[in-house]
Design a protein with these regions (language model features):
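Glycine-rich, positively charged active-site loop/lid region within alpha/beta enzyme cores that binds
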Residues: 154-175
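Catalytic alpha-helical scaffold of carbohydrate-active enzymes acting on polysaccharides/glycoconjugates
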Residues: 1-107, 112-160, 182-204, 211-213
Length: 213
């Protein structure tokens, strides 16, 4: 539910919390079942606070052989944080996941997908092997600052389920309406075929509260 709370204080209602709570309560299990049926391993980007609030769910992901990567601490928008606040959010998130799983996460994705000019230098301070937050390419590449080299695995909004399937009743008109499922699947399959033919890196992003239902 942390994505709703970070978007706007107006979303701190039982309805919006319940939409987010569906993810760890039911959505994750549905996704794990589907992944197991097709023998697929995935990366789950987890906010640190989710590891604290839903430890059994996060442990189940890890014990099923999937990667746990970091998604901030409380799904903070890094564009609204000072450099020190960004460091604190990353460190708290790392601590929460490492305490629960026994492993330090090696991957990172920005909550809300936004940041400040300093953010990537800050991320590299924590020795992540890769980040997956930017939209400037369709193949992985290295980000270097002279001290640390990190792989960037770019993503695309049109391959994020939230873009099509999230519903919020108090969003502006025309925003966040649920799309026709067949159309969404057709979009994703067209992208997959094109990426395969062109030898690109296909990164699809699903959230338990949306695709998990």
């Amino acid at each position: 539910e942390f994505i709703w709370l970070d978007m706007d204080p107006l979303y701190d209602t039982p309805k919006h919390r319940s939409m987010g709570e569906y993810g760890p309560k039911r959505g994750v299990d549905n996704i794990l079942t589907a992944l197991d049926d097709y023998h697929i391993k995935a990366t789950f980007f987890v906010p640190g606070i989710a590891a604290e609030k839903y430890p059994d769910t996060v442990l189940k992901i890890a014990e099923s052989g999937h990667e746990i990567a970091l998604h901030g601490y409380a799904h903070e928008n890094f564009a609204h944080l000072s450099p020190d606040e960004q460091r604190e959010a990353i460190q708290k998130g790392i601590n929460a996941i490492e305490k629960l799983t026994g492993k330090k996460p090696v991957g990172f994705r920005l909550p809300e997908g936004d940041c400040t000019p300093e953010t990537f230098d800050i991320i590299k301070e924590f020795d992540f092997l890769y980040d997956s937050s930017l939209f400037d390419n369709d193949i992985p590449y290295f980000i270097e600052n002279g001290k640390h080299k990190m792989t960037e695995i770019p993503m695309r909004w049109e391959m994020v389920d939230f873009t099509y399937l999230a519903w919020g009743g108090i969003f502006p008109a025309g925003a966040c309406r649920v799309a026709v499922y067949d159309d969404v699947l057709d979009n994703w399959l067209r992208e997959l075929n094109a990426f395969y033919d062109m030898g690109l890196c296909y990164v699809i992003t699903w959230t338990p509260q949306t695709i998990g239902s």
